[in-house]
């Protein structure tokens, strides 16, 4: 049996367990009483290397951007054997910047000290508030210092930078605020996904899908990632070619870019305060 065929058998079972078992489910998780997976598969042909025990923590904070989180979470949750935790200050639902509420599965204190992956989503004003929340910053700095992989999407890289995790690293983020990374000592890069050693950062919002697939390949292998991509039918063909400043009409770029002077000013102030606190 080919690797691709083995994967589709295994990944379909993994996806079913995620659907019936919740965010933190793994391929070995039993469905809740009275709810059984509709598909049963023979897993005996699965390559041993495709079953892991990854510990993944995805940070939640008020006002996060939902797609920043949900896109990568789909791919992380399809890593067979992985434990994917949604971590916040409390277990109370956390509301995104578009009003979608997500229930955390662990608090900051309950999150494992040693992680395979730390992930931080971005947002607008919410990430700035998070950057000024000393408890969140301390958590990100602590877990990120030991995590095997430190990752983010969109303006989430600003929070990583605020925690001192991107100093001297190449990194990306949402185009509106990418250059602010330099104020924290990072090296801004205009790419959709940037890997520098064990730091992997994604550009704005939808780049989380690409980051998620990138991490699946890193944590398993390319065939596994291709199988997850096929399972998700991820083959984007947007109706407009306006997804970057390089391709969007200049009037649109000017309009969107002109909405964020306050965001940029506050982010730069946080950077100055951070550097001053370090004596820099």
Language model features: what each stretch is:
Residues 2-150, 158-161, 178-179, 188, ...:
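Extended, subdomain-level signal for the structured scaffold at the beginning of enzyme domains
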Residues 54, 190-197:
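Glycine/charged-rich beta-loop-alpha catalytic/anionic-binding loops adjacent to active sites
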Residues 68, 204-211:
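Catalytic-loop motifs flanking and including active-site residues across diverse enzymes
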Residues 131-134, 172, 203:
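Residues at secondary-structure transition points
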Residues 150-151, 172, 189, 200:
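Structural detector of well-ordered beta-strand residues that form the stable sheet scaffold
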Residues 166-193:
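A conserved active-site-flanking secondary-structure segment within enzyme catalytic domains
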Residues 197-204:
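A short glycine-threonine-serine/GTX helix/turn-capping micro-motif
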